């Protein structure tokens, strides 16, 4: 049975959900359509009972954009989609983060969600439709799921909020925020903004949530029409006597440890010691307490000696101790108050050969950030279903295992690294200079050297500082902070600049970046249902105060971008040449432009309109390249003095001198010196640079070629070309 439901979101936008036509062997499958953009989402969840030792939900979300969807061929040599692009990875992360909290606690069955974009009108981006389709596929399946989830994008054009703006509308929007949520609450945020206020941010979220409620109701109606029963599921029940024993055995020690301010490594060692001793005690106690008859009568009692289950119970006690300490005493693991930011230290210019660098340390989180400036040739080519462009501003985030004191593999960039780098990039990009203001390609690399929470926000701060150190003219400084939340019933506490443990044991991770004038980027993940707007408002205001405190520290280190670029950064010089001269500068097969680069060390880029950009780290190289290019396109004029290179010598005739690139003239033997010259090679050598004057231009009657007559002796008293004296003589 094919079921189709649709809803009008207003502003001429209609979304439909269809199920029952495609992918019927999956546990659930839906097709979502908006305009001519269509996505199909499927979900399959294994029925194999997970091991009692498993403590995580193996959810895999894959988002793929098929090039046929837009009538395109994949770029590159192989005309087939291969590994996911950065855009696909980021879209998959958005969907994963919104879906994951809505599965039942303890549901550890392997689950795979696959979203394929099968049609793209190149105006409606499919990423948020993928989130809607994924949730709808789970809703119509037999897989347990708490509530329908929907994703929307909110934009604002000319002060008017828009749901799921088109690509063209986003061009003029000052907000681009993706929101995921249920009918009752928001569970995921991510986006970039052009310095909007906290109040405007809340308004955008509320606006998006109203559309989410409608889309969740649409999913509920589709589910009701399908009427498929959910498979039975009950989380693993741990015997109550195990919980009581663990609490008695370790709660007091864990509480004492929680109230002691310690460094991350020392706290981890002492926590590990408590875990080990409690585990040993529990295994010994219950092994002696239960006979084989007891275990036969109640098999669940065997869980009391399962080491993994015991560690989970200890972890539950540890979590409760930390949360009650924060809620009851407003005290945190490292002794800070709820809104206190960790100590900050900043060092600039720490990498001598980089074009800008900074070492930003906040507590036990440290980022070493380097900036590289390049030309348009260094821009990254990005090809998606909706856009093909060159990306000239990028931030790459690296999180090596040593940053958390672990041994791990170094290989391809992980999804987490791509996501964190993208967030930091979006935060800083809002204040980066335009291409017209600063025609460089900018690459920022953040190396996380230590991590105890909020490393992506350290990358925002470090990236801003490195750019300012490198002389990149940022409009304003940007800082970032990660906020946390502990909530039990009506009690709650908002935490500023959270630690790794506070992120892990808490209910929210809310990252906010911005300038003194407003927010430039945000990302939020919620682990609980029922986030009230007044809590969100409190978190945003507390984040604003924290951001300003960090900005104060950053401005103490460097109040504004340096006036000059770093010593080793390339200097860009732009000159305009006639369009018809472009081929002359490039030369046959690029021969001429390569020779200029080899001779001067300058990198040269030529636009179709005749704009020539010269990049070189030395003024001499830039000057040399400019002179060669100007000489290449210059028309030879009689009476002009040139510096040329001897190309060939004919002893009884004269010397052929290249006086402008690719153009030779003859210095007759009689024009070499004032005295009589018997043999040219006695006066000139091949490769020698000589000053010559163009004395005649004429066409060869036999060949029709232009011949240039040069004189060395006529140039003896003339000033060198390029000097003020030469310019004065030319003007006269």
UniProtKB/Swiss-Prot annotation:
SUPFAM superfamilies: Eukaryotic type KH-domain (KH-domain type I), Nucleic acid-binding proteins, Ribonuclease PH domain 2-like, Ribosomal protein S5 domain 2-like. One of its GO terms (biological process) is mRNA catabolic process. Residues 570-629 form the KH domain. Its EC number is 2.7.7.8. Keywords: Cytoplasm, Magnesium, Metal-binding, Nucleotidyltransferase, RNA-binding, Transferase. GO terms for cellular component: cytosol. Its main location: cytoplasm. Signal peptide: none annotated. It is an enzyme of class 2 (transferase). Mg(2+) binds at residues 503, 509. Coiled coil: none annotated. It is found in: Cytoplasm. It catalyses: RNA(n+1) + phosphate = RNA(n) + a ribonucleoside 5'-diphosphate. InterPro entries: ExoRNase_PH_dom1, ExoRNase_PH_dom2, ExoRNase_PH_dom2_sf, KH_dom, KH_dom_type_1, KH_dom_type_1_sf, NA-bd_OB-fold, PNPase. One of its GO terms (molecular function) is 3'-5'-RNA exonuclease activity. Pfam families: KH_1, PNPase, RNase_PH, RNase_PH_C, S1. Its cofactor is Mg(2+). Residues 639-713 form the S1 motif domain. Involved in mRNA degradation. Catalyzes the phosphorolysis of single-stranded polyribonucleotides processively in the 3'- to 5'-direction. HAMAP family: PNPase (MF_01595). Belongs to the polyribonucleotide nucleotidyltransferase family. This is Polyribonucleotide nucleotidyltransferase. It comes from Chlorobium phaeovibrioides (strain DSM 265 / 1930) (Prosthecochloris vibrioformis (strain DSM 265)).
